[in-house]
Amino acid sequence: MSPCENDPPINWKRNLIVAWLGCFLTGAAFSLVMPFLPLYVEQLGVTGHSALNMWSGIVFSITFLFSAIASPFWGGLADRKGRKLMLLRSALGMGIVMVLMGLAQNIWQFLILRALLGLLGGFVPNANALIATQVPRNKSGWALGTLSTGGVSGALLGPMAGGLLADSYGLRPVFFITASVLILCFFVTLFCIREKFQPVSKKEMLHMREVVTSLKNPKLVLSLFVTTLIIQVATGSIAPILTLYVRELAGNVSNVAFISGMIASVPGVAALLSAPRLGKLGDRIGPEKILITALIFSVLLLIPMSYVQTPLQLGILRFLLGAADGALLPAVQTLLVYNSSNQIAGRIFSYNQSFRDIGNVTGPLMGAAISANYGFRAVFLVTAGVVLFNAVYSWNSLRRRRIPQISN
């Protein structure tokens, strides 16, 4: 994988397409098992309503927790050995773990494997780092926005496919099907992605303090990490109460599950439509403007969600919120590209992933705690307050440093 002067230049557009496919496959693989995770926990011997809820929450959250712990290590290894190698490691490792999950005999085995899944993950942040280091800087927003739609598309289609497969073949076979998808992702990455990378010895690697001092604006980068965390907190805080809130709004209807599923899915559809377009706009006017505007827009949409009277009103607001959310993470990633070098891109994107995983763990806990004490509607108001704080914090960080104009 070491570069050679006679090698043809890397076709970053082809790599973007293949990386998008890889993110789609891993997004689908992760979400395939989500619809029946509590059912599988029950099948492994957990009984009783309280115990089932507790174990379902633990096995769901532990993956993100261990991913947050492991991401910086894999990011450092990516900066030493190359990002393609990390993509291959992640896809193959997760595929093997999925097979073992399908063979689990008790809840403790399953819990350990869910933790191992988090430890071996990291496909998406390494795909982001790979594309960020290859794409022309003036196209970063569009490229990273487009790449983000891969994981979103997979996450949207995965639960539907997982539910159908579980109904048709049972729960355990879905894990083997998921493993097959990840192995396919491994081979697609192996044969179709090109990277010119000169391995770096451990002695030549920058240490943490040197990474921080090499950043153009360390305080801004930290604020971007915090923004990523709050984006995930805001998204996750609504997830535990959404179905119950829809049931409260819908009243006595027979298809609450279908309505809830539709309302849960519409933000992802909106993000698919908005991410590449707003990313391209960010390349033109600046990703910092897109970020602040999308954060303020999110606040203005979250507040009325606490006052809606029908599921249709909630669905419309969530669609608009999804359009704003589609711009947020690509804008953050583009700003990270602008404020760091290729030498440390793997670690910067992995740190960002760690903050994202922490948000994935804390968001649902926050939403559940608020709803238990103050009701469903309070969740939206508190979340709006958190996002508003982040908008002010981000604006204050960004206005201190004008984003440099970077040419090809």
UniProtKB/Swiss-Prot annotation:
Q: Which UniProt keywords apply?
A: Antibiotic resistance, Cell inner membrane, Cell membrane, Membrane, Transmembrane, Transmembrane helix, Transport
Query: InterPro entries under this entry?
Result: MFS, MFS_dom, MFS_MdtG_subfamily, MFS_trans_sf, Mutidrug-R_MdtG, Tet-R_TetA/multi-R_MdtG-like
- Gene3D superfamilies membership: MFS general substrate transporter like domains (1.20.1250.20)
Q: Name one Pfam family in it.
A: MFS_1
- Indicate yes or no for the key word Phosphoprotein: no
Domain of life of the organism encoding this protein: Bacteria
Q: Does the keyword DNA damage apply?
A: no
A Gene Ontology biological process noted in the UniProt record is:
response to antibiotic
List all membrane-crossing ranges: 16-36, 58-78, 92-112, 115-135, 146-166, 173-193, 224-244, 256-276, 290-310, 319-339, 378-398
Gene Ontology molecular-function annotations:
transmembrane transporter activity
| Location(s) in or outside the cell | Cell inner membrane
A Gene Ontology term for the protein's cellular component: plasma membrane
Instruction: Give the family, as the similarity comment puts it.
Output: Belongs to the major facilitator superfamily. DHA1 family. MdtG (TC 2.A.1.2.20) subfamily.
Q: What does this protein do?
A: Confers resistance to fosfomycin and deoxycholate.
What name has this protein been given in UniProt? Answer: Multidrug resistance protein MdtG
